UniProtKB/Swiss-Prot annotation:
GO terms for molecular function: antiporter activity; xenobiotic transmembrane transporter activity. It comes from Bacillus subtilis (strain 168). GO terms for cellular component: plasma membrane. Belongs to the multi antimicrobial extrusion (MATE) (TC 2.A.66.1) family. This is Uncharacterized transporter YisQ. The keyword Iron-sulfur does not apply.
Length: 455
């Protein structure tokens, strides 16, 4: 992408800082990519230690991923509400929301972290973990999960910085955390510099230490950039009206994510019925095609910040046009990258496996992304735009109806009952994404969201 492409999208001073979609989006793209990498780095590096440790950490990460979704709802509300207040030049109120979001996410995440620490074993038993894997999984979940409130605070500070347009700062912190995490993993897995080989426990400590340092960096940067002083009195003073606004945006957003994750767990169960090869094919295919989603995710987050400001400044036409332009770019990029991946699909899958059956099936699934990913772009872009406008409930209702009323039934019908296998599952994904995408598009075109602004 070239910066010139996005010049016409520049936000014209609804606050002190002027920025374009491009200036917001490229750091977010790198940050999201690195967060995905950091989530997989522990597993990848532990594969050099033992297969059991990989399995144990993999199961623990499934629980941790659900916890992250629970933390994200405050961060989502923070981005929207602060952006709206800045757009309407209510800087004092924007600062108050920042304090409320830090305090609220601290209390919520601390409580969840405590539950995870003390209930680690029952939670792992619920996942069907074998006794052989329990010791490693317990250690990892208790250390990383017990300190997961640190990640919640990082997400909150990151949301605050992004709302003010400082997306590069959050990117650099994420880069630093990745470097520290990988370096620490090397030390504790391979026993470098005289350190003992600590395996899973060492990796858990390495991950947590990297996050602690990342949090400290975030606090320093927020203080420097927006003069947000870490006063306990201000952080723990819960401004009821601001908290209500955060929850009004955040809770529906979390509900949508939880609904999606739960529906995907059921889809995974359907695929498990097809056998281990089908599961392996699904993992390889989604690991490859996840790259397509990263572009849409970055564009949607940058768009959300801009639209939040436009809504706060009552620039509704500008907000409408910003969403539509972002949608067109996301559709074009999704289509182009899907076609490229289809052309080189066999080479890409060959990086993971030499199985002819897996390569053939995965190639078909990647070809189907040419239809799937543009539909997903509608949802990724417009849902975040609706949230930025304060219209958070509609996407949740439509998601539940489409995922559970269309996606899952079709997954069973085509994948299991009619015997189409993974191709049938992908057909259900296409149907779900396009039905929701069209509904989101109609909602945005209706401009009902103009009535939902919160600041």
């Amino acid at each position: 992408m070239k910066q010139a492409v996005f010049k016409s999208t520049a936000l014209k001073k609804p606050a002190d800082k002027t920025f374009s979609l491009f200036s917001l989006t490229w750091p977010i793209f790198i940050e999201v990519s690195l967060y995905m990498f950091m989530g997989n780095a522990d597993t990848l590096m532990l594969s050099q230690y033992s297969d059991n440790s990989v399995a144990a950490v993999g199961v623990s990460n499934q629980i941790l991923n659900l916890i992250i979704v629970m933390f994200s709802f405050i961060a989502t509300g923070t981005t929207v509400i602060i952006s709206q207040f800045l757009g309407s030049r209510q800087k004092k109120e924007a600062m108050e929301v920042a304090y409320v979001s830090i305090g609220a996410n601290f209390f919520i995440s601390l409580a969840i972290s405590a539950v995870v620490f003390f209930a680690a074993v029952p939670l792992l038993h619920m996942m069907g973990l074998s006794d052989a894997l329990m010791p490693d999984a317990k250690v990892f979940l208790q250390v990383v999960g017990g300190l997961s409130f640190i990640q919640a605070l990082i997400m909150t500070f990151s949301a605050i910085l992004k709302s003010y347009g400082y997306t590069k700062d959050t990117m650099f912190v994420t880069i630093g955390m990745n470097i520290l995490n990988i370096a620490g993993n090397f030390v504790v897995i391979f026993g470098l510099f005289g350190f003992p080989v600590l395996g899973v426990a060492g990796v858990a400590m390495s991950t947590s230490i990297a996050r602690v340092i990342g949090l400290i960096a975030m606090i320093v940067i927020v203080n420097k950039r927006i003069q947000l002083k870490m006063s306990l009195k201000k952080v723990f003073h819960m401004h009821k009206e601001h908290l209500r606004k955060l929850l009004k945006i955040g809770i529906p957003s979390a509900g949508e994510q939880l609904s999606y994750n739960l529906s995907q767990m059921i889809v995974t169960y359907f695929i498990a019925i097809m056998g281990a090869q089908a599961l392996t094919t699904k993992v390889y295919t989604q690991n490859i095609t996840m790259f397509i989603l990263l572009f849409g995710t970055a564009i949607s987050q940058g768009t959300q910040i801009l639209i939040g400001r436009y809504i706060g400044g009552k620039q509704f036409d500008a907000a409408y046009e910003r969403c539509m332009k972002s949608l067109y770019w996301a559709l074009g990029i999704a289509a182009a990258t899907s076609v490229l991946m289809t052309i080189f699909s066999k080479d890409l899958i060959g990086l993971f496996t030499q199985s002819p059956d897996i390569i053939a099936t995965a190639s078909l699934l990647i070809a189907m992304t040419i239809i799937l990913e543009p539909g997903r772009s509608f949802n990724v872009i417009i849902i975040n735009s609706l949230r930025a406008a304060g219209d958070a409930k509609f996407p949740v209702y439509m998601a539940m109806i489409s995922m559970w009323g269309i996606g899952l039934p079709l997954a069973y019908l085509f994948g299991i009952h009619l015997g189409f296998g993974l191709a049938g599952i992908w057909i259900s994904f296409i149907a779900d994404e396009w039905v929701r995408g069209i509904l989101m598009y109609r909602r945005w075109r209706s401009r009902i969201w103009i009535q939902k602004g919160m600041a």
